[in-house]
């Protein structure tokens, strides 16, 4: 997992809608305009979706909404992008269903995860289901939790003066990572309450405000190429 996970915060920072369902790579010489144009979000078939690309990213990351909760993204780039589809608000008791038809990642780093934020206190969370060559396992190891037929290691880290959904803030990251990648082409569940309860038992309960969006995220960084096709429900 990328050391500065909170760069994914930009995905959930804005909620501007976009009529296009396929979002091509964005190029602009003006840094401010590039920052704005490289973020798109909206709703599709009742699901919230978003894609964000870092300033200076070269190459491409092409996101497309499919039917229902489906989306796909293909990329060949050097930089960082995040995208996904899910809900306009989080929930500590949501059970996420998904089927990842394909996930390939060559070079760089990245993961596919259930992702979101809470407030009061401000916290960033991930449940990592799949990844590239490097398993997300940075930060302090806290405990192990069993859920949905798998075993997850729980990690936490403190971020000081880092990007967040509320601007530059200090906040805690908390995340669960499966001990092995989940399989593709099959239906899976993420019983989020199991993770939220395990984090709370370790002393790092999520905030009381779960209103920020929560998505099934695809993220990649560095020099990488790949493809993900996933349906969430």
Region spans (language model):
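Extracellular-facing/secreted segment signature in eukaryotic proteins
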Residues: 46-47, 56-66, 145-160, 186-191
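Short N-terminal edge-element motif at the start of the domain
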Residues: 31-39, 58-106
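Bacterial Sec-dependent N-terminal signal peptides
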Residues: 5, 16-38
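Boundary/junction segments of secreted and surface-exposed precursor proteins
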Residues: 38-46, 50
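An exposed acidic His-Trp-rich patch
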Residues: 121-184
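Extracellular-facing segments of soluble proteins and assemblies that are Gly/Ser/Thr-biased and enriched
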Residues: 84-147
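Sec-dependent signal peptide recognition
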Residues: 2-8
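Long, compositionally biased interface segments
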Residues: 186-233
């Amino acid at each position: 997992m990328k050391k500065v996970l909170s760069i994914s915060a930009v995905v959930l920072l804005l909620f501007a809608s976009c009529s296009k369902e396929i979002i091509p790579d964005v190029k602009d010489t003006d840094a401010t305009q590039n920052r704005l144009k490289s973020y798109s979000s909206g709703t599709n078939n009742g699901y919230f979706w978003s894609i964000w690309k870092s300033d200076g990213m070269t190459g491409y990351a092409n996101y497309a909404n499919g039917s229902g909760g489906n989306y796909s993204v293909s990329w060949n780039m050097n930089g960082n992008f995040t995208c996904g589809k899910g809900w306009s608000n989080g929930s500590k008791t949501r059970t996420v269903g998904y089927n990842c038809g394909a996930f390939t990642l060559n070079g760089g780093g990245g993961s596919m995860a259930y992702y979101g934020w809470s407030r009061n206190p401000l916290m960033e969370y991930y449940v990592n289901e799949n990844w590239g060559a490097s398993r997300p396992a940075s930060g302090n190891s806290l405990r192990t939790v069993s859920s949905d037929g798998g075993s997850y290691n729980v990690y936490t880290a403190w971020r000081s003066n880092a990007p967040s959904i509320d601007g530059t803030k200090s906040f805690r990251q908390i995340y669960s990572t499966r001990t092995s990648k989940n399989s593709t082409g099959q239906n899976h569940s993420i019983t989020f309450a199991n993770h939220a309860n395990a984090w709370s038992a370790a002393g790092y309960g999520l905030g009381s405000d779960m209103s920020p969006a929560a998505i099934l995220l695809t993220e990649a960084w560095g020099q990488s190429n790949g493809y993900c096709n996933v349906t969430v429900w």
